């Protein structure tokens, strides 16, 4: 089973929101977020996992890229 999550930084915490499942979690760091997300998904899909089905998490993130003008040599 493939479950998609959007991750984003809300200014204080890293957050993960399920796009296919009613799951939300957060962490102070990306590592903490990933650990919390794994635990939340395992609990949410406990019956699925107990039936021997595998769970795959697809993590989606948006990154802003701004144009930085090249340094003009004088």
What are these regions (language model features)?
Residues 13, 27-29, 49:
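Extended rod-forming repeat segments used as scaffolds/tethers
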Residues 1, 20-21:
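Generic structural signal for short, solvent-exposed loop/turn connectors between secondary structure elements
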Residues 1-6, 31-74:
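Short, charged, surface-exposed hinge/linker loops at domain edges
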Residues 21-31:
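A short, exposed loop/beta-hairpin motif centered on an aromatic-Gly-Thr core
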Residues 15-17, 26, 35:
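Short acidic, gly/pro-rich beta-turn/loop elements at beta-sheet edges
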Residues 8-20:
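Short aromatic-glycine-(Arg/Gly/Cys) micro-motifs in beta-strand/loop hairpins
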């Amino acid at each position: 089973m493939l479950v998609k999550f959007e991750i984003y930084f809300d200014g204080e915490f890293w957050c993960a929101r399920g796009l296919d499942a009613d799951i939300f979690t957060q962490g102070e760091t990306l590592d903490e977020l990933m650990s919390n997300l794994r635990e939340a998904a395992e609990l949410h899909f406990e019956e699925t996992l107990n039936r021997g089905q595998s769970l795959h998490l697809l993590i989606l993130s948006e990154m802003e890229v701004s144009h930085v003008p090249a340094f003009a040599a004088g």
